[in-house]
């Protein structure tokens, strides 16, 4: 229904962004809102997919058509909902996920929150041979720098989460420096470490 939303990126939260267009602010759930950070207060185009449930209508947004297509493929798998699909795409590119599927790499897939061995196997069974590994979408509006790592993303998402909890940028400046010196297995782990640093 909504192929994309184009407008001013007004707000950035750990799980979603807000884009204002024609006087309306659209709340858009995203895999990794940090990827949009450099566009805050500027015009942005976000590819979208509207999912209607009994209790809500949710708009999901993506940095490229390839990412959007991967999301739509994942939510067709039994046991995979939008939340799990977003978690997979939060720290992996579509091609990385496709390679894991084609190589039947269950171990790679089970590293994501909410994805157990049974669900990982179902992803492979349902999608192997149906997802094509291609060059990353060349017209993607937003690209994560080549030097950006999963660890960088964990830290940046943790910082967004801490800021959303009300901590000031001044308080978080020292925290970010410390977090960047360590390695974490998840965003939650980085957030917990950050909270300990803030209250210490």
UniProtKB/Swiss-Prot annotation:
InterPro entries assigned to the protein according to its UniProt record, in alphabetical order: DNA_helicase_Holl-junc_RuvA_I, Hlx-hairpin-Hlx_DNA-bd_motif, NA-bd_OB-fold, RuvA, RuvA_2-like, RuvA_C, RuvA_C_sf
Q: Which domain of life is it from?
A: Bacteria
UniProt keyword annotations, A-Z:
Cytoplasm, DNA damage, DNA recombination, DNA repair, DNA-binding
Instruction: Locate the transmembrane regions by residue number.
Output: none
Q: Where is this region: Flexible linker?
A: 143-149
Which stretches of sequence are listed as region Domain I? 1-63
Ranges for the region named Domain II are 64-142
Where in or outside the cell?
Answer: Cytoplasm
Keyword Electron transport on this protein?
no
Q: Which family does it belong to?
A: Belongs to the RuvA family.
- What function does this protein fulfil? The RuvA-RuvB-RuvC complex processes Holliday junction (HJ) DNA during genetic recombination and DNA repair, while the RuvA-RuvB complex plays an important role in the rescue of blocked DNA replication forks via replication fork reversal (RFR). RuvA specifically binds to HJ cruciform DNA, conferring on it an open structure. The RuvB hexamer acts as an ATP-dependent pump, pulling dsDNA into and through the RuvAB complex. HJ branch migration allows RuvC to scan DNA until it finds its consensus sequence, where it cleaves and resolves the cruciform DNA.
Complex and partners: Homotetramer. Forms an RuvA(8)-RuvB(12)-Holliday junction (HJ) complex. HJ DNA is sandwiched between 2 RuvA tetramers; dsDNA enters through RuvA and exits via RuvB. An RuvB hexamer assembles on each DNA strand where it exits the tetramer. Each RuvB hexamer is contacted by two RuvA subunits (via domain III) on 2 adjacent RuvB subunits; this complex drives branch migration. In the full resolvosome a probable DNA-RuvA(4)-RuvB(12)-RuvC(2) complex forms which resolves the HJ.
The record's note on its domains: Has three domains with a flexible linker between the domains II and III and assumes an 'L' shape. Domain III is highly mobile and contacts RuvB.
Please give the name of this protein.
Holliday junction branch migration complex subunit RuvA
- Native source species: Staphylococcus aureus (strain JH9)
Q: What gene does the UniProt entry assign to this protein?
A: ruvA
